[in-house]
């Protein structure tokens, strides 16, 4: 499917509707020199297995753009903060694009997210613009997952007025000096060749820009652009079995490629976990100390030498033991405007009691309402009235 210099005649109507132009289940879609304009969402022909928008203009609000596509030499007018609902699959790639953030000059800092619910974004050789006194904070998504990594190289922002995503935020990876950059572009003799062939070539060597021969000669094909783990959260039990962690590298069109993945643990309890390499794409995690007596959480990071990254939480649970015995019934005493719960164990124990306070209108505990809870390993023995 392709649309080039195509104009759909305007039919004015007073109704306010979403501009959902078309759906397609085609394998390939290429739009060139097209304008997609809607101030109430947008839907610029989505659904193809591989989509390229070349030298196109977009005007939109939220949930508007194709979240699994390549945009080359395109221009965007953002009238709201979340132009993509979700960057699905291997995400969205913007090559040499310009983003105009159409926010008022009101002195407020406006949040410009790329997605509403997450997904991978790559920004290459792109720039942001806005009105002279507009302030904008550029972010990937409002609630990023631990696994989310977005990639950027040579992105420019209006100095002093725009705040870019920080590399230190753990979700932003600058690939300008990394081998991964060649998945998106090749710099040669002062010229930039955008590697759309690597991104969209697939098994049938689709070459919409006609530079596939140059890319193949340079050996820059089948370069993965995404690293995934099997889950975003793993569980380790003290005294339990080790867990096997597997990762995979995907090309932009979703084909799995072999790659060497390196794993490491970060967090306050990182020293309590041992990593054993199993293969080039997997590892075993095992607790060094089986006597851990509290719950904790660390972050497992995975990366390749080319520059791909991802992450996951590893939750560590203490060994399950029998509940300690009490010397007698617990007692609640009134101390001024405080209630204090007192109890003792028959043997010295690390007190991990989970105490929950309720409020009820009668002694039969009808319509009880939770008013206070314990934090992990911190029994809530005192309640303020």
List each language-model region with its residue ranges:
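Proline-enriched interdomain boundary motifs that mark the N-terminal boundary
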Residues: 223-231, 321-330
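Short, solvent-exposed loop/linker segments at the N-terminal edge
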Residues: 233-241, 331-337
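A short beta-strand segment in extracellular, disulfide-stabilized domains
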Residues: 242-248, 336-345
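Solvent-exposed loop segments of extracellular immunoglobulin-like
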Residues: 257-261, 348-356
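Low-complexity "stalk/linker" and mucin-like segments enriched in Ser/Thr/Pro/Ala/Gly
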Residues: 264-282, 360-369, 373
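Solvent-exposed segments in extracellular or luminal domains encompassing
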Residues: 284-291, 369-385
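A short beta-strand micro-motif common to beta-rich folds, especially ectodomain repeats
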Residues: 293-306, 380-385
């Amino acid at each position: 499917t392709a649309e080039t210099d195509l104009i759909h005649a305007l039919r004015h109507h007073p109704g306010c509707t979403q501009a959902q132009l078309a759906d397609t289940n085609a394998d390939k879609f290429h739009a060139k020199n097209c304008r997609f304009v809607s101030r109430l969402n947008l839907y610029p022909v989505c659904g193809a297995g591989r989509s390229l928008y070349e030298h196109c203009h977009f005007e939109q609000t939220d949930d508007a753009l194709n979240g699994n596509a390549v945009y080359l030499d395109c221009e965007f007018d953002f009238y709201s903060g979340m132009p993509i609902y979700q960057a699905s699959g291997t995400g969205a790639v913007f090559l040499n694009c310009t983003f105009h953030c159409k926010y008022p000059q009101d002195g407020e800092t406006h949040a410009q997210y790329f997605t509403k619910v997450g997904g991978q974004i790559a920004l290459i050789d792109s720039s942001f613009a806005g009105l002279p006194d507009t302030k904008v904070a550029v972010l990937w998504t409002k609630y990023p997952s631990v696994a989310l990594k977005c990639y950027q190289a040579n992105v420019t922002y209006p100095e002093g007025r725009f705040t870019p995503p920080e590399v230190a935020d753990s979700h932003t990876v600058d690939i300008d000096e990394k081998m991964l950059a060649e998945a998106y572009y090749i710099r040669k003799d002062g010229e930039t060749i955008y590697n759309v062939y690597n991104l969209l070539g697939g098994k049938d060597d689709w070459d919409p820009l006609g530079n596939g021969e140059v890319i193949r000669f340079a050996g820059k094909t089948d370069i993965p652009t995404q690293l995934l783990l099997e889950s975003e959260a793993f569980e380790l039990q003290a005294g339990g079995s080790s867990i096997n962690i597997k990762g995979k590298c995907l090309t932009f069109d979703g084909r799995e490629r072999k790659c060497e993945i390196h794993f490491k643990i970060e967090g306050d309890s990182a020293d309590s976990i041992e990593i054993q390499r199993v293969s080039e794409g997997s590892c075993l995690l095992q607790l060094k100390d089986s006597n851990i007596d509290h719950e904790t959480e660390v972050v497992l990071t995975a990366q390749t030498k080319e520059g791909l990254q991802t992450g996951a939480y590893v939750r560590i649970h203490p060994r399950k033991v029998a509940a300690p015995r009490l010397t007698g019934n617990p007692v609640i005493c009134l101390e001024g405007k405080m209630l204090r719960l007192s109890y003792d164990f028959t043997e010295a124990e690390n007190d991990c009691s989970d105490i929950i306070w309720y409020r009820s209108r009668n002694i039969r505990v009808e319509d009880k309402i939770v008013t206070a809870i314990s934090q992990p390993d911190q029994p809530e023995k005192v309640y303020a009235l």
